[in-house]
């Protein structure tokens, strides 16, 4: 196990998470006692206690007063906030993880974009208007794309969609910086934002579904061609 961390707490957190991932502490098992675990990792019990509380909040563990700490099945108990951690733990699975992430984005955005256009068109157009002045480089487009989808999610009037996008932010923007290094990807995105604005202005709500699905398909094709050049550090240094 190779762990890179800058603090005792960071080291302890990575040690426990990687031990859960590698089944040293499998789901359903009980963690070693606090004294034993702190000695095993090489941190103070105070530091360990803080780390365990944080991991419990993220869904990795269940802590109950007077009972041993239990390892959870994190797929069932954690939220989107662990996406970056999963990508870091298993780089070989990053392409599939990203495919799943983009599929979720497409599926839910067909709903919240249509709702935003129908119920709050002025807010939606204000979000889309931000694409007019974007600088032509990957970082700017990665931020723009995330902020447009997030902005439209909140413009729908249902903040839960926005919270879902918040949970995707870290991995989403890292993907975006690689994806939008392609001029073709940047051009496709600008065309998509422009088409969305026209649909919103025209009140053509029923066209949203097909427009978003087509963009998901076309951007997916570009992404799959780029996967061969996926940088090895895409999922690294997430902390």
From Swiss-Prot:
Coiled coil: none annotated. Gene3D superfamilies: GntR ligand-binding domain-like (1.20.120.530), Winged helix-like DNA-binding domain superfamily/Winged helix DNA-binding domain (1.10.10.10). Residues 6-74 form the HTH gntR-type domain. Residues 34-53 bind DNA. One of its GO terms (cellular component) is cytoplasm. It is found in: Cytoplasm. One of its GO terms (molecular function) is DNA-binding transcription factor activity. GO terms for biological process: fatty acid metabolic process; regulation of fatty acid metabolic process. InterPro entries: FA-response_TF_FadR (IPR014178), FadR_C (IPR028374), TF_FadR/GntR_C (IPR008920), Tscrpt_reg_HTH_GntR (IPR000524), WH-like_DNA-bd_sf (IPR036388), WH_DNA-bd_sf (IPR036390). Keywords: Activator, Cytoplasm, DNA-binding, Fatty acid metabolism, Lipid metabolism, Repressor, Transcription, Transcription regulation. Its main location: cytoplasm. Homodimer. Multifunctional regulator of fatty acid metabolism. PANTHER family: FATTY ACID METABOLISM REGULATOR PROTEIN (PTHR43537:SF52), TRANSCRIPTIONAL REGULATOR, GNTR FAMILY (PTHR43537). This is Fatty acid metabolism regulator protein.
């Amino acid at each position: 196990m190779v762990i890179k961390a800058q603090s005792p707490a960071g080291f302890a957190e990575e040690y426990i998470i990687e031990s859960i991932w590698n089944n040293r502490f499998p789901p359903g098992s009980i963690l070693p006692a606090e004294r034993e675990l702190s000695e095993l990792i090489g941190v103070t019990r105070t530091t360990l206690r803080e780390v365990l509380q944080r991991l419990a909040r993220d869904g990795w563990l269940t802590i109950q007063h007077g009972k041993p700490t239990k390892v959870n099945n994190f797929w069932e108990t954690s939220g989107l906030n662990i996406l970056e951690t999963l990508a870091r733990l298993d780089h070989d699975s990053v392409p599939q993880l990203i495919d799943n992430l983009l599929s979720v984005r497409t599926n839910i955005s067909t709903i919240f974009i249509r709702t935003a256009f129908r119920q709050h068109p002025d807010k939606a157009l204000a979000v889309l208007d931000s694409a007019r002045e974007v600088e032509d480089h990957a970082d700017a487009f990665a931020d723009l794309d995330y902020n447009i989808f997030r902005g439209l999610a909140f413009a729908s009037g249902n903040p839960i969609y926005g919270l879902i996008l918040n949970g995707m932010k870290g991995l989403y923007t890292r993907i975006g910086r690689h994806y939008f290094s392609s001029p073709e990807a940047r051009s496709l995105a600008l065309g998509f934002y422009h088409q969305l604005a026209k649909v919103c202005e025209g009140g053509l709500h029923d066209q949203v579904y097909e427009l978003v699905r087509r963009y998901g398909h076309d951007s997916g094709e570009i992404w799959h061609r780029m996967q061969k050049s996926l940088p090895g550090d895409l999922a690294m240094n997430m902390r």
